[in-house]
């Protein structure tokens, strides 16, 4: 059995309309329980990024480790920028490095700074699955940052469960359903038996109750 956008719309409508109002814009999340995977085999652990058709619905924190023109463009695009000097300061301040790792969803680094990024931030970014992606000198850092604002991380850790964002509460259920389907298609494409390995699917707002889809 597969899930369609139509299957998702009503559960999404319920979680958006009936969850108690909050003082902040909640995200809408999807929880996918998978069966028949051997997590001791790294090749069976899903770790992907999915560009959502309608975006995340709210900004995401992006950190760029760079200098010069790339740093300037990244800052203008709204990213947090760490230069070489700040990076070396973080080498002596693990607490601050961990705080930066927690607060940011995506990390990019000027390619020639990657060895230093690995040395200083690798220990805090690696376990979180957030290791910085190298950016060559001719790359459009603005485009990468813009893409990050439309991207969901789809990652399976120590349990056969994927918990990911599919949008924000102020989005239409139909938009959220399209985003959810993009994520589900990516997940099932990584599974040997595709939809047969999907055990259950739930949707919820950040602080609201979960609604079962499948």
Swiss-Prot record:
<keyword id="KW-0689">Ribosomal protein</keyword>
<keyword id="KW-0687">Ribonucleoprotein</keyword>
<protein>
    <recommendedName>
        <fullName>Large ribosomal subunit protein uL1</fullName>
    </recommendedName>
</protein>
<dbReference type="GO" id="GO:0006412">
    <property type="term" value="P:translation"/>
</dbReference>
<dbReference type="GO" id="GO:0015934">
    <property type="term" value="C:large ribosomal subunit"/>
</dbReference>
<dbReference type="InterPro" id="IPR002143">
    <property type="entry name" value="Ribosomal_uL1"/>
</dbReference>
<dbReference type="Pfam" id="PF00687">
    <property type="entry name" value="Ribosomal_L1"/>
</dbReference>
<keyword id="KW-0810">Translation regulation</keyword>
<dbReference type="InterPro" id="IPR016095">
    <property type="entry name" value="Ribosomal_uL1_3-a/b-sand"/>
</dbReference>
<keyword id="KW-0699">rRNA-binding</keyword>
<dbReference type="InterPro" id="IPR028364">
    <property type="entry name" value="Ribosomal_uL1/biogenesis"/>
</dbReference>
<comment type="function">
    <text>Protein L1 is also a translational repressor protein, it controls the translation of its operon by binding to its mRNA.</text>
</comment>
<comment type="function">
    <text>Binds directly to 23S rRNA. Probably involved in E site tRNA release.</text>
</comment>
<keyword id="KW-0678">Repressor</keyword>
<comment type="similarity">
    <text>Belongs to the universal ribosomal protein uL1 family.</text>
</comment>
<dbReference type="GO" id="GO:0019843">
    <property type="term" value="F:rRNA binding"/>
</dbReference>
<comment type="subunit">
    <text>Part of the 50S ribosomal subunit.</text>
</comment>
<dbReference type="GO" id="GO:0000049">
    <property type="term" value="F:tRNA binding"/>
</dbReference>
<dbReference type="InterPro" id="IPR023669">
    <property type="entry name" value="Ribosomal_uL1_arc"/>
</dbReference>
<keyword id="KW-0820">tRNA-binding</keyword>
<dbReference type="GO" id="GO:0003735">
    <property type="term" value="F:structural constituent of ribosome"/>
</dbReference>
<dbReference type="GO" id="GO:0006417">
    <property type="term" value="P:regulation of translation"/>
</dbReference>
<keyword id="KW-0694">RNA-binding</keyword>
<dbReference type="InterPro" id="IPR023674">
    <property type="entry name" value="Ribosomal_uL1-like"/>
</dbReference>
